[in-house]
């Protein structure tokens, strides 16, 4: 249920940002706001504390963000405080990023490897994925030594697991079945 609400909030904010031609600005501001909220224990505790009034929480946010972010974005934060959803701002940001990718005909491909891919490998992988999905691909690389070797690629719900670890796990299962 909450994912649906997160999506609705994110879509509403995205449409405002799109109307104002400030989508990138809103996304960047939301990322920074999340860093401030989740990176500052004192602020986080104020927001989280049930005995601190909504009025005081809103005042705190106005003091921090007024004049630094767009008024519509600040209003959005005020609504989240009123609805007691401000602690779930990260989820709204994630949904807004998904909407942004969808609207730009782009998919996020998460790639795990033991060593960073070379520019040539990235280019070839992106080309292959763009051909397969007929969409632009945004590649996010992660180094994961536990996979031993090969690549692990996730695009949406699709997984391409060409890791040495998965092959070894498969061989182990086959050998255990034979016993």
Swiss-Prot record:
InterPro entries: ATP_synth_OSCP/delta_N_sf, ATPase_OSCP/d_CS, ATPase_OSCP/dsu. It holds the Pfam family OSCP. It is found in: Cell membrane. It is a peripheral membrane protein. Keywords: ATP synthesis, Cell membrane, CF(1), Hydrogen ion transport, Ion transport, Membrane, Transport. One of its GO terms (cellular component) is plasma membrane. The keyword Acyltransferase does not apply. It comes from the Bacteria. One of its GO terms (molecular function) is proton-transporting ATP synthase activity, rotational mechanism. Its main location: membrane. Belongs to the ATPase delta chain family. F(1)F(0) ATP synthase produces ATP from ADP in the presence of a proton or sodium gradient. F-type ATPases consist of two structural domains, F(1) containing the extramembraneous catalytic core and F(0) containing the membrane proton channel, linked together by a central stalk and a peripheral stalk. During catalysis, ATP synthesis in the catalytic domain of F(1) is coupled via a rotary mechanism of the central stalk subunits to proton translocation. This protein is part of the stalk that links CF(0) to CF(1). It either transmits conformational changes from CF(0) to CF(1) or is implicated in proton conduction. F-type ATPases have 2 components, F(1) - the catalytic core - and F(0) - the membrane proton channel. F(1) has five subunits: alpha(3), beta(3), gamma(1), delta(1), epsilon(1). F(0) has three main subunits: a(1), b(2) and c(10-14). The alpha and beta chains form an alternating ring which encloses part of the gamma chain. F(1) is attached to F(0) by a central stalk formed by the gamma and epsilon chains, while a peripheral stalk is formed by the delta and b chains. This is ATP synthase subunit delta. The gene is atpH.
């Amino acid at each position: 249920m909450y994912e649906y609400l997160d999506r609705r909030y994110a879509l509403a904010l995205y449409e405002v940002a799109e109307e104002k031609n400030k989508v990138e600005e809103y996304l960047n501001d939301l990322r920074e706001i999340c860093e401030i909220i989740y990176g500052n224990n004192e602020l986080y505790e104020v927001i989280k504390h049930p005995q601190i009034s909504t009025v005081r929480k809103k005042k705190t946010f106005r003091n921090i963000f007024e004049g630094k972010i767009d008024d519509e974005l600040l209003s959005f934060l005020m609504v989240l405080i009123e609805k007691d959803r401000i602690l779930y701002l990260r989820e709204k940001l994630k949904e807004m990023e998904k909407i942004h990718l969808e609207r730009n005909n782009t998919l996020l491909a998460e790639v795990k490897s033991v060593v960073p891919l070379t520019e040539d490998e990235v280019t070839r992988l992106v080309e292959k994925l763009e051909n397969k999905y007929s969409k632009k691909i945004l590649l996010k690389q992660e180094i994961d030594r536990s996979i031993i070797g090969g690549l692990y690629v996730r695009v949406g719900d699709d997984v391409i697991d060409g890791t040495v670890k998965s092959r070894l796990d498969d061989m182990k299962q086959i050998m255990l079945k034979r016993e």
